[in-house]
UniProtKB/Swiss-Prot annotation:
Database matches in Pfam families: Ribosomal_S11
Organism from which the protein derives: Prochlorococcus marinus (strain MIT 9211)
Superkingdom: Bacteria
Biological process terms in GO annotation: translation
Family membership: Belongs to the universal ribosomal protein uS11 family.
Transmembrane recorded as keyword: no
Keyword flag Repeat: no
Protein name, per record: Small ribosomal subunit protein uS11
């Protein structure tokens, strides 16, 4: 009779990362928060969809706040204290996500807007008529 395979614990090790970079991608439909170390390796991440919101509610500021709190909680468990914040996109969850990171106990040293702006590249989609 075959023996069942032994289940091993999580392969992720709890590493001590004191400084990091928070990437907030805020679109009109969702907000994604990724927290990386200074080398760019992801320590924790969360999004409005992963926090349990569906559909149009993913684009709300409250959903962005919930996602940022969840990502910050996991980063704090791994010893993160100081962060730089890079914000990308035009969404409504930008400010609330930054505020949630600060309330969670992370010290913000820098906030930078890295939204890509075209120097008249591709043609824009046609206007939506409702």
């Amino acid at each position: 009779m075959a023996t069942p395979a032994k289940k091993t614990g999580s392969k992720k090790s709890k590493r001590n990362v004191p400084n990091g970079v928070v990437h907030i991608q805020s679109t009109f439909n969702n907000t994604i928060v990724s927290i990386t170390d200074t080398n760019g390796e992801v320590v924790s991440w969360s999004s409005a969809g992963a926090s349990g919101f569906k559909g149009a509610r993913k684009g709300t500021p409250f959903a962005a706040q919930t996602a940022a709190e969840a990502a910050a909680r996991r980063a704090l468990e791994q010893g993160m204290r100081q962060i730089e914040v890079l914000v990308r996109g035009p969404g409504s969850g930008r400010e609330t996500a930054i505020r949630a990171l600060q309330v969670a106990g992370l010290e913000i040293t820098l906030i930078r807007d890295v939204t890509p702006l075209p120097h008249n590249g591709c043609r824009r989609p046609k206007r939506r008529r409702v």
